[in-house]
């Protein structure tokens, strides 16, 4: 996510979510991303925790500030650790116009790439935003909207999203 999208708070919320689920996971957050430094840290972490990671008992969360770095990062990481499984969660605060999203948000490029909508405590998700995400082929995985790192991260569910759309339309019609 871009600056101001809520990356740092989201990573803390994601860590809390992983650590408090029915099958808890230990989490390590890699902040202040720097390709060379972070790859060294991740390789060291992976070497120390390889068995826990492969047993899905430990998870690493890497905070990237610029999506342009992701291709180089993924290439370098896969060269160093071919067994590592990666999912990408792009963050986008709500409250953007359709035109802004179409111009500034890249198309989904990877099978394991998802979307988290942030700042839902500050602004409502609009129908035009949903349309842009659909056109850009993004799958929404999380909604985030409370400033506390202990709460406010929810899995995006079709029924709840559909209810939100219906409520929004009814409030505008009625």
Where on the chain are the PLM-derived regions?
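Switch II (G3) loop of P-loop NTPases
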Residues: 2-3, 26-74, 81, 90-94
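Conserved lysine of the Walker
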Residues: 7
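Post-Walker A helix-loop "phosphate-sensing" segment adjacent to the P-loop in P-loop NTPases
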Residues: 16-28
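Conserved catalytic network of the ASCE P-loop NTPase/AAA+ motor domain
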Residues: 20-21, 50-56, 79-85, 107-110, ...
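Conserved ATPase-coupling elements of RecA-like P-loop NTPase cores
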Residues: 68-75, 99-102, 125-128
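Conserved beta-strand/loop subsegment of P-loop NTPase cores
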Residues: 84-92, 109-127, 134-150
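NTP-binding/hydrolysis catalytic cores, primarily Walker-type P-loop NTPases
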Residues: 133-174
